[in-house]
A protein has these predicted regions:
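N-terminal binding-site loop/beta-alpha segment at the start of enzyme catalytic domains
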Residues: 1-80, 143
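A general structural detector for well-ordered alpha-helical segments in enzyme core domains, enriched
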Residues: 2, 37, 41, 64-71, ...
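Conserved, mostly hydrophobic/aromatic
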Residues: 6, 18, 45, 53, ...
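Glycine/proline-rich, positively charged
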Residues: 24-27, 89-207, 214-221, 227-228, ...
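Structured C-terminal cap/extension of enzyme domains
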Residues: 46, 51, 70, 167-169, ...
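Short catalytic-loop micro-motif centered on adjacent basic/acidic residues
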Residues: 52-59, 148-152, 174-175, 248-250
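Short beta->alpha linker loops
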Residues: 59, 63, 155-156, 254
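Structural motif corresponding to the early beta-alpha repeats
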Residues: 59, 75-94, 119
Length: 276
């Protein structure tokens, strides 16, 4: 598994991260996790060098944190990076930030989070993050060793990102980035803003929720003609991972076939060429 060093810390992060928003479910209706099948995915990920596991308070109706904390419990704590996020829309008063954070530690059965994010920042809710002192509290948790690195995930326009980046000091940021959204959702400019400020980039939605695994018949034919031995999804993963300021690419893998394909892509990683 290809790894990249986080800043100058010496910490090596797998370039493929396991996103825990689309784990196997017991049925197509609802969000209940199929714990047995999901555990198989986590075990395969760990065995193949994935050491970055991204969850959130709200994923799978609140089950995701509890699941991934339990799934990783059998492995040495210093061999993986556990990541979760603060849902500011669940906060009604300052005290709620601390209450939710402590609940997350309990959910995940850990004493600290390796990477922690202010979740889904946009122009409107950034005011709430400021009002409720979320950054200040989370910075205190960082000082106490309960958070190693503090960042944010983002869903808005580039000028909003510039304001967010310049208001506080961030260790990393997570954005939606893929070859469709590079222009359409301003991912290019968002990526540049982070790169200009020396903020490492975590990529979410590299395959755009599966859309880029089967974009259209004409595109599929071009991909298969160029590399008949590679999956169509692998092109999207490689696109994101080829950018120099990307630390890891998150993929929500809901079955073993998907994770095997992505692991193969990142174990024998080939950056995109000009011809590609």
């Amino acid at each position: 598994m290809l790894k990249r060093t986080y800043k100058d810390t010496g910490l090596e992060i797998s370039t493929l991260g396991l996103g825990c928003m689309r784990l196997p479910k017991v049925s197509t209706e609802g969000e209940e996790i199929d714990f047995e099948k999901a555990q198989e995915i986590v075990d395969y990920a760990y065995a193949n060098g994935i050491n970055y596991y991204d969850t959130a308070y709200i994923y799978h109706g609140g089950q995701s944190e509890e699941f991934i904390g339990g799934a990783l419990k059998k492995y040495p704590r210093d061999t993986y990076n556990l990541v979760t996020k603060m849902p500011i829309w669940r906060v009604e008063k300052k005290e709620d930030v601390e209450q939710i954070f402590n609940e997350q530690l309990k959910n995940c059965q850990v004493e600290y989070f390796d990477f922690y994010l202010c979740h889904a920042i946009n122009e409107d809710n950034f005011k709430q993050y400021i009002e409720y002192g979320a950054y200040e509290f989370l910075s205190k948790m960082k000082e106490e060793g309960k958070i190693r690195y503090l960042g944010f995930s983002f869903h808005d326009k580039p000028h909003v990102m510039e304001n967010v980046c310049d208001t506080y000091k961030w260790d990393f940021a997570q954005i939606q980035l893929n070859y469709l959204d590079w222009e359409m959702q301003d991912a290019k400019r968002q990526y540049e803003i982070l790169e200009e400020r020396g903020i490492p980039c975590i990529v979410m939605e590299p395959v755009r929720g599966g859309v880029l695994a089967n974009p259209c018949e004409a595109s599929n034919e071009l991909f298969k003609e160029a590399r008949p031995d590679k999956s169509i999804a692998s092109w999207a993963i490689r696109y994101a991972a080829s950018l120099p300021n990307v630390l890891t690419v998150l993929s929500g893998m809901s079955n073993l076939d998907q994770i095997k394909d992505n692991v193969e892509t990142m174990t024998h990683f080939e950056p995109l060429t000009e011809k590609d």
